[in-house]
């Protein structure tokens, strides 16, 4: 919390957190004008805890989770921005929709069915590797999907504009491949203590 307060004092206003319990604890003690982004795996039963204040959820990986976010946002009469997580990495441990699952969801989703969410883009995590060509290819693939959706399902939708990809170890590649939002933690705050 002290490191976040220090970053806040230096002018930072957008913060991401990958654990729901830690996010709610930090939100209670840090300044109220912080724009909180949730960037980790999210379970449906955790949505109610972050719904009152969360700005953007980067890690939507199922229709069930989308529906729960909509339900909890409705209880607070607010719209929550979401990004659909796309599984682009070689690792099985990573979460997200396959590109085909994403297309199927979006082509069949009626926006009026989820009035309290706003789909603003996609999020992806590349394979954790030193192979920069593999990382570049994975980011390139998600950017192609983003462009395809921007020109079809979201044609004319000014809100569908975010491509969240790139972390401390691979953000330069992500930026070159079209990222609009990078998630930097380790490079600023050091290794996380679990």
Identify the meaning behind each predicted range.
Residues 179-194:
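Gly/Pro- and small hydrophobic-enriched strand-loop and loop-to-helix capping segments
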Residues 1-169, 175-177, 189:
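Conserved alpha/beta-domain cores
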